Amino acid sequence: MKFMGANELREKYLSFFESKDHLRLQSFPLVPKNDKSLLLINAGMAPLKPYFTGLEEPPKRRITTCQKCIRTGDIENVGKTSRHGTFFEMLGNFSFGDYFKSEIIPWAWEFITETLGIPKDKLYVTIYLNDDEAYDIWTSKTDVDPSRIFRLGKDDNFWEIGVGPCGPCTEIHFDRGEGKVETVEEFLEASDADRIVEFWNLVFTQFDKDEEGNYNELAQKNIDTGMGLERIATIMQGVDNIFEIDTVKNILNKACELTNAKYGEDKDKDVSLRIITDHGKSVTFLICDGVQPSNEGRGYVLRRLLRRAARHGRLLGVKGIFLNEMVDAVVENYGEAYPELREKADYIKKIIKLEEERFNETIDSGMDILMSYISEMEEKNEKVLSGAKAFKLYDTYGFPLELTQEILEEKGLELDIENFNKEMKEQRERARNARGESSYMGSEESPVNKVDASIVTEFDGYVNLELNSKVIVLGNNEEFKAELKEGEEGFLLTDKTPFYAEMGGQVGDRGNITSETGMAIVTDCKKNVGGKFVHYIKVIEGSLKEGQEVKLSVDASRRSNICKNHTATHMLHEALKEVLGDHVNQSGSYVDEERLRFDFTHFAALTEEELEKVELLVNEKIMTVSVVDTKEMSLDEARNSGATCLFDEKYAEKVRVVSVGDFSKELCGGTHVANSGEIGLFKIVSESGVAAGIRRIEAVTGISALKFMELKNNMLKEAASMLKCNEKDIAKRIAAQAHELKEKDKEIAELKAKLVQGAEDDILKDKVEINGVELVTAELKDVDGNSLRDLADKVRNKLNNGIVVLASDNGGKVNLVAMATKNSLANGVHCGKVIKEVAAVVGGGGGGRPDMAQAGGKNPENIAKALEKAKEVVELLVK
C-alpha cells in the first residue's frame, strides 16, 4: 500500500463523495447548536441530527463531511495507552431519503480498494445476522470474496438506541496479520487481539422501533456512515497507534522538544508525552470553536484537559508556561483543513497562557494541602481520603477533583467519591435555592419542538413591521390546539411574519396579533429546535383559530430601540479592534430595547483612556450619519470583502452582510437602523472581566444614553452638595478627606501598637507549666494580625522552654497565632498542630510550622474555649 498522510486521506475521501454528487460541508463547530443533549460534538452525525429526525430540511439529500469530535468518557486512559484520544476526526457520508444499500456498499468498496488501494486479501466485511439484502449487494455488486463476509448479531452489527429509528449496519475491517481467518470464531478472536481492526461503519437506518419492540419499515430510509480519520491513517501508514500517524507524531515531537524528553525511552514519560500531545490538540480546537475555561459544562472539560496536560509537563520537569507553544504544531498540521486555527492562533495561545498561569498558582497552594492530607493518612495508616477534604480542595482552592484522584492513585490511595459527590450535590442545591427556580415554555418534549419539518415561515420583517398572514399551527405547553381562547397562553406559527425571532444575541420582537375573532399579545418570538419561527402569545380578547387570517404587528418603538443597540454593537466591535488591536473578537453579545452587552477577547482591563477612545470613535461615526447597508452574498464573497465572521458560528453558503458606511462590515441576520445617525448617542456604562481573556462592555444608546448621563449628572450635584463644593472640585475634596482619614488611621494604629508593646509583661503573668514546658495564652481586643505576631514574638523571647498562643477579636473576626521556642520542639511542641485544633473551636482553619503557625476564625465568642483547647493539645503533645 502507498503511504498516505492524514491530510491527503481527508481530501481524498471528501473529493470521492463529491464525485458521487454529495454536498461537502465544512466541519461544524465542536459546540452543538440547539442540542441540549450534547456537551460537545462527539460523532460525525451529531450535528446532522435535525436532518435525520425531520426537524430541518437538509441543504441537499447527499452530504459528506469531516467532522471534528471530542470524547472525554475514557479520559483516564488517554496517555496510559497509545489507542485512546480525546480529539478525533470522523469522515462521513450521509443520505437523507435518497440512496441506500445498493449504492453505498459498492461506493465504499470502490473507495477502499481503488482510491486507497488497500489489498482485497487484507479486508473482511461483517453484516447483520439476517441482512440478506446487504449480503446479496456485497456479493453481486462488488468483487469481495464471499468467504470474507461474516454474519454477526445485534451487539456487533445493529444500531439502535431505545425506541425510534434504527437499523442494521455493515462494517469493513483490516487484517494486520498474516493468513486468512476462516470462521466467525476465528474472526472474533483476531478482532479481540487487535489483529483485525474495524475502520468503517455503514449504518442502514430502515426501521422504526416502537414501544412494544416491533420493527416497522421507515418510509424514508437513511444512510449514516462513519470512518475515523486517525484509524484509517494508521492503516495507510503502516503503524499501530494514533500517536504514530504523521499529523499527531509531529505534535508529539513538539511536546518532546518543549519538555526536553525523548519518546520511547521511559514508560512514565511516554504517558505524560501522550497526554500533552492529545490534550494540547483538543484544547486548541476547543478554544478555537469558542469554548472558554470555566468550572462547569464544556468550559470545565477544557479546563480539565488543559490542567491535566500542564501537570504532566511538571512531571517531566517543565518550569513555567509551555502549553501555549503547542498551538503552533497543531496549526501547522491542521491549519489547511481548518483555516480558523490560523486566524485565531494568537488568541488561542493567550487563553492557554492565562489559564496555565492560573493553574500554576492553584496547583502550588493546592498541592501543599493535598500532600499534608496524604502525610496525615500515612501517619494514621489510612487508605481513603475523605470526600469532605477533597471537596474543600476543589471548592476553596480550585484544585481539580481528577488531579486529586490521579495523585492519590499514584500513591496507592483512594478517594471517598461518594461523600465528595454528596458535598457537591448539597452545594449545588444551595446555589439553586439562592438563585431561585425558573422555567420557560419550550422543553424539548413540548409540542412547540415537534412541529412538522415541512412547515416554513417566511420572515419579512427587515422593512415591514405589519403584515397579514395565516395561522398554520397553534398550541400550548401540553398539546397542539385548534383554538386558543381569552386568557390562555400558548404559541402560534404563521406562513410569514414580521416578528424577528431571538437569534445572534438579539432578543425577539413583541407586539400583537389580531383576527376577526380575537386579539393576542406577542410576549416573545423565538426559534424552536427545528429553526421554526414561534410566536409566544397570550390571548386577551376572543380567540385565535388555526387556519384563519391574522394581522401581525410588531411593537415599532421597541424594535427601533433594539435596532439602535444592535447597530451600535457592530460599531463598538470595530472601534475596539481599532483601539486595542485585531486580536479583539466577539465572544458573545446581548441586545434588547434598553441596552447592549458585548463580550470580546482581550487580556487586560481597559484603561480609562482606552474606554474614552472607543466611546469617542463610536460617537464620531454615529455623527457621520453613514448609511447602514445590507447585502446577501456567498460566504466566500463575504470573507473576501473583509466582512467580520464570528469564529464559533456555522454559516450557510448564502450570508447577509451588514455594513455601516466604510467603518464596519459584519455577517449578521439581525435588524438594524437605516443610518448611523438614528442611534443618536452611545455611552459606555461599564467594563468588566467575565472569564480568562474575555472582557465585557455594557452600553446604552439614544434616549437611554441621555437618561444615563442625566442620572450621572444628578449624582454629581448631590455629591457636591454633601461635600459643600462645586462639581469641578469634587475630586479634590474627596482626595483631601481621604488623606485626612489615612492620617487618622495611622494615628490609631500607632496608639494600638503602643498599647500592645506594653502588654507582654501582663500576658506572662498567666504563664503555666506543663511537664516542663511553659504555656502562655491570652485573649486581646482589636489587635490586627501583624501586631499580634509581633507581640507573640516578644513573649516567646522571654520564655526559656515554651509556647505562646494568642487570640484577638478584631472587628468580629478572630486572629490566632502560636509561637514556640526551639528547645520546646524537642519536647513534642508543634505550633501547626496546636493552631489547627484551636482554630476549629472558633470556626476557622489554618496551620503552619512546628515553631510558628497562624489561623483565622469567625466566632469570637468561643475564644476562651479555644485557649482552653490550646492547653489540652499541649498537654497531649508533651506527655
From Swiss-Prot:
Residues annotated for Zn(2+) binding in this entry: H566, H570, C668, H672
Gene Ontology, cellular component aspect: cytosol
Gene Ontology biological process terms from the UniProt entry: alanyl-tRNA aminoacylation
Molecular function per GO: alanine-tRNA ligase activity; aminoacyl-tRNA deacylase activity; ATP binding; catalytic activity, acting on a protein; transferase activity; tRNA binding; zinc ion binding
Superkingdom classification of source: Bacteria
UniProt entry tagged with the keyword Oxidoreductase: no
This protein's UniProt keywords: Aminoacyl-tRNA synthetase, ATP-binding, Cytoplasm, Ligase, Metal-binding, Nucleotide-binding, Protein biosynthesis, RNA-binding, tRNA-binding, Zinc
Record field: catalytic activity: tRNA(Ala) + L-alanine + ATP = L-alanyl-tRNA(Ala) + AMP + diphosphate
Keyword Coiled coil carried by entry: no
Pfam families reported in the protein's UniProt record: DHHA1, tRNA-synt_2c, tRNA_SAD
Cofactor note: Binds 1 zinc ion per subunit.
CDD domains: AlaRS_core (cd00673)
Enzyme Commission identifier(s): 6.1.1.7
Subcellular compartments: Cytoplasm
Cofactor(s) the protein requires to work: Zn(2+)
PANTHER family, A to Z: ALANINE--TRNA LIGASE, CYTOPLASMIC (PTHR11777:SF9), ALANYL-TRNA SYNTHETASE (PTHR11777)
Entry comment, domain topic: Consists of three domains; the N-terminal catalytic domain, the editing domain and the C-terminal C-Ala domain. The editing domain removes incorrectly charged amino acids, while the C-Ala domain, along with tRNA(Ala), serves as a bridge to cooperatively bring together the editing and aminoacylation centers thus stimulating deacylation of misacylated tRNAs.
Family from the record: Belongs to the class-II aminoacyl-tRNA synthetase family.
Function field: Catalyzes the attachment of alanine to tRNA(Ala) in a two-step reaction: alanine is first activated by ATP to form Ala-AMP and then transferred to the acceptor end of tRNA(Ala). Also edits incorrectly charged Ser-tRNA(Ala) and Gly-tRNA(Ala) via its editing domain.
NCBIfam families reported in the protein's UniProt record: alaS
Entry protein name: Alanine--tRNA ligase
Source taxonomy: Bacteria, Bacillati, Bacillota, Clostridia, Eubacteriales
Name of the gene this protein is made from: alaS
